[in-house]
Amino acid sequence: MLKLENISFKVGVDGSDLEIIDNISLEISDGSFTVITGPNGGGKSTLARLIMGIEKPTEGRILFNGEDITSLSVTERAKKGIGYAFQQPPRFKGLTVRRLLSLAAGSELPEDECCGYLTSVGLCSKDYLNREMDTSLSGGEAKRIEIATLMARKLNLAIFDEPEAGIDLWSFSMLVESFKAMCSGSHESAIV
């Protein structure tokens, strides 16, 4: 379970503090699918970065499975089973999609399992398994592959920051169903 207690986040701008997030509390149960909505610049991505540990709150606590993780690093949170998909996925020249999925899973994945992850995000696995994760991929393709890597990790908490970026509406509807299936009947939670 993820619990945010009175989380605030401020940044210094021209000698004064700009409040990005003000006193947010929320609880996300194991196995839940949670969507956070709001206007552009409303703090959604900042909240995701706070949960992942990329940013630290100026006030409040973040608890994960009863443990205070507020001061833990990104790496320490990842070891606890928290994963994050960026708005702009990274590219890895020389690394194939299949190898990336295996790295995410922590061991060499059989081809059929890799294909299953790619299919669940709307990609034809035969077209992508041996492709490199480089700039030849469109933004939407890279985003889907990054989502598939989080699915392969079998996380306790997966955070998807603007997963719709670069993805058409029909495909995103299918991704939402994949997110729900990921959480259904498991302890894995997803925040979109």
Q: Which residues does each predicted region cover?
A:
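The feature captures the beta-strand-to-loop junction immediately N-terminal to the Walker
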Residues: T37-P39
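Walker B catalytic motif
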Residues: E162-P163, W170
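Helix-to-loop junction immediately C-terminal to a conserved catalytic motif
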Residues: M52
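ABC ATPase NBD coupling module
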Residues: D68-G83
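Q-loop/switch helix immediately C-terminal to the Walker
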Residues: Q88, G94-E113
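ABC ATPase C-loop
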Residues: L150-M151
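Conserved ABC transporter NBD signature motif
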Residues: G60-E67, K80, E113
